A protein has these predicted regions:
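Non-catalytic, conserved peripheral segments adjacent to functional cores
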Residues: 1-54, 78, 87, 92-94
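Residue-level detector of short, conserved catalytic/binding motifs and their immediate flanks
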Residues: 26, 63, 81
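Conserved metal-binding segment of the jelly-roll/cupin
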Residues: 56-72
Length: 97
C-alpha cells in the first residue's frame, strides 16, 4: 500500500503510452474527493487504439485495474489528487509492461 499523487494536466491531453501489470491488479482509492479521468484498454499483447476508453470519476469512487488491463496513470481534472494505492510487487518478474 502506498500514496500516489495524480497531477493536474493541461487539456487537450495527448496520451502517448499505456502500461499494464501482468501479474497483479491495482486499486486506487481517492482521498481528496476531486474528479479524475481514467483511461483504459482491455488486456492484450499490445494496446489497440480502437479499444481505448476514458471515464470521469466523481472523486468519490475508486478504481480497480484487473491484472493485464492497459491504463494511463490517473489524471486529475482540477487539482493534484492523492490516492491510496493497493497493489502487489513481484521481485522476480517484470511487474510493469
Amino acid at each position: 500500500m502506498h500514496i500516489f499523487v495524480a497531477k493536474k494536466r493541461q487539456f487537450p491531453l495527448q496520451i502517448k503510452m499505456l502500461e499494464k501489470h501482468p501479474f497483479f491488479s491495482q486499486t486506487f482509492i481517492p482521498k481528496d474527493n476531486q474528479p479524475f479521468l481514467v483511461v483504459v484498454a482491455p488486456p492484450s499483447d499490445e494496446p489497440n487504439i480502437e479499444d481505448i476508453r476514458s471515464f470521469i470519476s466523481n472523486g468519490e469512487q475508486g478504481v480497480n485495474y484487473s491484472r493485464g488491463v492497459w491504463h494511463f496513470p490517473l489524471i486529475s481534472v482540477n487539482d493534484d489528487t492523492q490516492f491510496i494505492v493497493i497493489d502487489r510487487k513481484y521481485e522476480d518478474r517484470k511487474s510493469v509492461v
